[in-house]
UniProtKB/Swiss-Prot annotation:
Keywords: Acetylation, Cytoplasm, Ribonucleoprotein, Ribosomal protein
Organism per entry: Schizosaccharomyces pombe (strain 972 / ATCC 24843) (Fission yeast)
Family indicated by similarity: Belongs to the eukaryotic ribosomal protein eS1 family.
Residue numbers bearing the N-acetylalanine modification: 2
The protein's name in its UniProt record: Small ribosomal subunit protein eS1A
GN (gene name): rps101
Main location: cytoplasm
Segments passing through the bilayer: none
Pfam families: Ribosomal_S3Ae
Amino acid sequence: MAVGKNKRLSKGKKGIKKRVVDPFSRKDWYDIKAPAFFEVKNVGKTLVNRTAGLKNANDSLKGRILEVSLADLQKDEEHSFRKVKLRVEDIQGKSCLTSFNGFDMTSDKLRSLVRKWQSTIEANQTIKTTDGYLCRIFVIGFTSRRVNQVKKTTYAQSSQIRAIHQKMFQVIQNQANGCSMKELVQKLIPEVIGRAIEKATNNIYPLQNVFVRKVKILKAPKHDAQKLLELHGESQDVGSKVISDVAPLESV
């Protein structure tokens, strides 16, 4: 007779089932609020573990990076190849107040632009906004045929590429310097910088499909409650004295 445990036998008593706990029962949904310079303010919801003990749900949400399609933010499918990154700065009730944290292009759109018989020209420039953001702007463009050109290829010479790089740097500096982040985003959405580069480089070599490929935030300012409310169009006097004896306004 063999002596020892039979590993095939199940542990515990028969008939007792392990209790299944729904993981979503310990989580809460929070609304995501986009800054006021986008057309849509309520962009979705995010999930977080409910406050328990020393773990606070608000602390888990702060600093979270969310990626949203620009088409959803602007209600325009033409911007479906754009992605906007939003960073959660503060929590008000069940709402997450966010700030702009980056701009990107989808990989399928970028791959569709790269073709043979043309030169790809890229440049990037670091700029600082008036409200304290330090960001790097990446642009990309492609050479196109000249008017009445018979030649199949549109390859630019190295000297022309260097000249186009200089023009790209100048246009980015001229368009971005002296702008706040809100004003910069309002230029990025309609592709103002890309059109300005096409116009500035036309006499060197004609370009097509010039886009701001990416905006990377290198350094962001700290947002206090008042500035964050202004960013979301909910600015109000915080902590100001309330005067009860106020004369009623005359009807107009």
